[in-house]
Amino acid sequence: MKKKTFLCLILTAAIFLSAFSTFRNEQGMDGANVVSSVTPEDTADCGAIWANKFSTKGFSCNSIPIMGANGIYIVNSNTLYELSYANGQVLRKTTLKEKMDSVCNMLLEEHFLYIPLANGTMECVDINSMTSLWQSESFGGQSLSTTFYHNGYLYAGTTNVLSNGTTTGLFYCLNAKDGSTVWTYEDKDHPGGYYWSGAIVYEDALYFTGDNGILVSHSLTESVVYDTAVLTTANIRAGLTYHKETDALYTVAKDGTLFQIQCGNQKITKVSSGKIMNGANFVTCTSTPTIYNNRLYVGCMADQYGYVCIMDALTLKPIYQVKGFQNAEVKSSPLVSTRGSSTGEVTVYFSMNALPGGLYAFKDTEGNLL
């Protein structure tokens, strides 16, 4: 049986100006997942420009797309494709040493594409020549976390899903030049994998969290833990992001608790929290927040409906929610576009984890309460 997996280009070419080099273009600075490109404003401006399909045996998924100078890079199964911006045709391709898991959060730094793959491995491909330069050792498990790059080092985590639904895993650091292991971290007393979560650098420490709900402050280049903090007993399957005005990190637990985390001198100094949906009987959230103009946007499912929640990033209190469809969780990290405007109005884009699939948008402005 062959499964055909499709990649559709939905937005106009203007969104390519964003040129994201990794998931959310997260680089540990203010404004992650916020763009100024003149993106489409309404349904009439949207639609598929082209679609491509990859024919594979059995089940396969597409990685996140990476925008390069010469094309779009995407992995399906164990093949890396370079696609034309104009029509989606395959320009070049190369076979990887492992297949990707259900998620593959690649990262492009200069002309080096770092690709997390099955069995807890990372492979580096030079996209100028489309040749593999190195493959890391195997850490085991699935590569489901985001990938973070900082000053010549790569950071990512692994996940092993056990029969009872719990997870184990480790976090690791690689030398980006040759793929050699610099350090690994595993909390065997409080096991938990790194399932869609990831790391961020603040000042001179690496911060990451995962399914055990524990935030870790770790040395960038040595096997040294500076500090830990138990944020929650729930899983954390969202990434961390930074907000300049509060000088704080933010993440969300699976139970819908939003955390604001202040750090200094490699220590976790203060943790504040708030609920993204008050009054709901059941909430699940794996969406990484996006922050703009002190408003925080995060997706979830609450009482069987998908939502995007708009929160006050200063007080951690809900402002309002945008309701989606039944049984259609908003797992995506909302993309906020200013469209080059200085009025404060933004367009917020998101997708829902349900068929038939698609892209949705709404407008928001400072002071908007509904």
Regions found by a protein language model. Give the residues of each.
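Positively charged n-region of N-terminal signal peptides that target proteins for export
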Residues: M1-T5
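Hydrophobic core
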Residues: L11, I15-S18
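Extracytoplasmic/lumenal domain signature
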Residues: T22-N62, I66-V103, L107-L144, F148-L370
